[in-house]
């Protein structure tokens, strides 16, 4: 029986997977990548110094895994938020933790990964996903007795703006275009003022989409 030949594409795909596995094994753990010398505020692995605006938060605030390491079961089911969200948004912004995987090679179990369901500006996502920027020093734990008040939110009624007439020059151009195209419509052209809704700049998914991160992780 003739031996079946292996397609070159399958060999290339296998080699790609082997390279990816080696890179993953050789990649330094988060406890090494994000280790910080609190005296010089330099990360030993990269040799980079934290930006000036992060110095105060590094000494006063905590990383996410630093908070969760003090709680039973690493705080599963608890609510965590960020100081920047509390300052910038009036609507509730928080993560409800569903899964935590600490880095057991870290000295104080203060590094690792976490997953949760995001509520941003009062809108809750349907599925849990990995929490980004867990190494930043601006995470805060919502006390249990304050969770009900923190999550309560009544959205304000949205008012649909009324359309307004076009400026005279634009109106004349639109009517001339209609006449040129043979449009017999006599409807007055109106300008809609309805806003196109976009996610805020600090929405976590928008930050994940950025391929190039400026500066050093706080």
Swiss-Prot record:
Keywords: Mitochondrion, Ribonucleoprotein, Ribosomal protein. One of its GO terms (molecular function) is structural constituent of ribosome. It comes from the Eukaryota. GO terms for cellular component: mitochondrial inner membrane; mitochondrial small ribosomal subunit. Residues 178-218 are annotated as: Disordered. The keyword Cytoplasm does not apply. Disulfide bonds: none annotated. It holds the Pfam family MRP-S34. InterPro entries: Ribosomal_mS34. One of its GO terms (biological process) is mitochondrial translation. It is found in: Mitochondrion. Required for mitochondrial translation, plays a role in maintaining the stability of the small ribosomal subunit and the 12S rRNA that are required for mitoribosome formation. Belongs to the mitochondrion-specific ribosomal protein mS34 family. Component of the mitochondrial ribosome small subunit (28S) which comprises a 12S rRNA and about 30 distinct proteins. This is Small ribosomal subunit protein mS34.
């Amino acid at each position: 029986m003739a031996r079946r030949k292996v397609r070159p594409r399958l060999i290339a795909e296998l080699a790609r997977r082997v390279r990816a596995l080696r890179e993953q094994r050789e990649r330094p753990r988060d406890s090494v990548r994000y280790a910080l010398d609190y005296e010089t505020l330099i990360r030993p692995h990269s040799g980079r110094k934290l930006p000036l605006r992060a110095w105060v938060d590094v000494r006063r605030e905590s990383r996410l895994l630093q908070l969760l390491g003090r709680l039973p079961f690493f705080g599963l089911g608890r609510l965590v938020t960020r100081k920047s969200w509390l300052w910038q948004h009036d609507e509730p912004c928080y993560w409800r933790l569903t899964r935590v995987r600490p880095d057991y090679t870290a000295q104080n179990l203060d590094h690792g990964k976490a997953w949760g369901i995001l509520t941003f500006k009062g809108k809750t996502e349907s599925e849990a996903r990995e929490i980004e920027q867990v190494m930043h020093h601006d995470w805060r734990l919502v006390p249990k007795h304050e969770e009900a008040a923190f999550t309560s939110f009544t959205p304000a009624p949205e008012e649909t703006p009324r359309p307004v007439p076009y400026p005279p020059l634009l109106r004349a151009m639109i009517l001339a275009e209609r006449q040129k195209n043979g449009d017999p419509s006599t409807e007055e052209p109106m300008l809609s003022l309805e806003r196109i809704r976009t996610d805020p700049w600090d929405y976590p998914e928008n930050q994940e989409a950025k391929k190039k991160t400026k500066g050093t992780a706080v």
